Curated annotation (Swiss-Prot):
Lineage, uppermost ranks: Eukaryota, Metazoa, Chordata, Craniata, Vertebrata
Keyword Aminoacyl-tRNA synthetase attributed: no
Protein encoded by which gene: eif5a
SUPFAM superfamilies, per database record: Nucleic acid-binding proteins, Translation proteins SH3-like domain
Protein name (record): Eukaryotic translation initiation factor 5A-1
UniProt xrefs under CDD domains: S1_eIF5A
Cellular location(s): Cytoplasm; Nucleus; Endoplasmic reticulum membrane
Length: 155
């Protein structure tokens, strides 16, 4: 009856990676897609309506995965895409060959995330080497995932 080749374990419910929101409704510290990248809004300003046209919204955002800065200007009445962002905490179990072994709440272990570059990656490796029990916060948006934060595990 069941086809053994079908595996639905990693499927989603067909939810979109983004949803539309009017430019004027966006807020600082919110999220938006700029130049095709999921960004956190760090600066936002509006200009008055001109003789011809609408009020404009000037957005400056930092990519949540690469920390690159992106800017865009759009009319306040237009819709912008806002990324659906999921934030999960996983227990750090092991680090091997540049990949994190992370245990989920249900006991499953995932080993598909790289140790992040920069200071966070060094901090994760140092604290793990010192034997500290840590929770790694993983952000996922638009088909990408990355470890973004580290916190001590509560006893």
């Amino acid at each position: 009856m069941a086809d053994p080749d079908l595996d639905f374990a990693s499927g989603d419910a067909g939810a979109s990676a983004t949803y539309p929101m009017q430019c004027s409704a966006l807020r600082k510290n919110g999220f938006v897609v700029l130049k095709g990248r999921p960004c956190k809004i760090v600066e936002m300003s509006t200009s008055k309506t001109g003789k011809h046209g609408h009020a404009k919204v000037h957005l400056v955002g930092i990519d949540i995965f690469t920390n690159k800065k992106y800017e865009d200007i759009c009319p306040s009445t237009h819709n912008m895409d806002v990324p659906n962002i999921k934030r999960n905490d996983y227990q750090l179990v092991d680090i091997s060959e540049g990949f994190l072994s992370l245990m989920m709440d249900n006991g499953d272990v995932r080993e598909d995330l790289r140790v992040p570059d920069g200071d966070l990656g060094k901090e994760i490796e140092n604290k793990f080497a010192a034997g500290e029990e840590m929770l790694v916060t993983v952000l996922s948006a638009m088909g990408e995932e990355s470890a973004v934060a580290l916190k001590p595990m509560t006893k």
